[in-house]
Amino acid sequence: MQLELLNDQGQAASKIDVPETVFDRQYNEDLIHQIVVAYRANARQGTRAQKDREQVRHSTKKPFKQKGTGNARAGMTSSPLWRGGGRIFPNLPEENFTQKINKKMYRAGMASILSQLAREGRLAVVDSLKVETPKTKVLADKFKAMNLQSVMVISDEVDENLYLASRNLKNVFVVEPRYADPVSLVHYKKVLVTKGAIDKLKEMFA
């Protein structure tokens, strides 16, 4: 299989051979959905918390007498039926959101995403991506010349200059192959892969 090799202006300069086991796999929507949901679930910090009726600070005094007022009977204002009362089923920090995905499924899902991106024309190859100075404007101008507004770059090597230049760009995400994740691949409109990263992706997902 061949993919476009882009020049500095974002135009297809030539074609490059890439492994079909990674970039020409059958599209598996169910598997992709499963690994994306699992990745997002496993990234949750699990720190959210709500209070039940025992934890809410309210008086235990009966708000009004049992009979004669015409109101529904009430025992205390911490009841979940009352505004400001506790939750019936509160979210707790100790909830476990972990979802297990075995390695074979994850590799197949990632290869399926990369293959679909290639079919849609959202994935292309560049020789390399380097900047001489850690200046955001330099990298922003480079992507502007290539007509890229939302891009994920999978580079075989992310040096300090490239990291510092890219971290303040809102719609740019630069990573090494080992840090590529399904959510980012699906999110960004364009994915650029350096020539040196292709072999690493093959080792990881073929």
Curated annotation (Swiss-Prot):
Gene3D superfamilies reported in the protein's UniProt record: 3.40.1370.10
GO MF annotation terms: rRNA binding; structural constituent of ribosome
Tree of life domain: Bacteria
InterPro entries, A to Z: Ribosomal_uL4 (IPR002136), Ribosomal_uL4-like (IPR013005), Ribosomal_uL4_dom_sf (IPR023574)
Pfam family, one: Ribosomal_L4
GO CC entries: ribonucleoprotein complex; ribosome
GO annotation (BP), single: translation
Region annotation (Disordered) ranges: 46-77
Keyword terms, alphabetized: Ribonucleoprotein, Ribosomal protein, RNA-binding, rRNA-binding
Protein family per UniProt: Belongs to the universal ribosomal protein uL4 family.
Subunit structure: Part of the 50S ribosomal subunit.
Purpose of the protein: One of the primary rRNA binding proteins, this protein initially binds near the 5'-end of the 23S rRNA. It is important during the early stages of 50S assembly. It makes multiple contacts with different domains of the 23S rRNA in the assembled 50S subunit and ribosome. Forms part of the polypeptide exit tunnel.
This protein's name: Large ribosomal subunit protein uL4
Organism: Paracidovorax citrulli (strain AAC00-1) (Acidovorax citrulli)
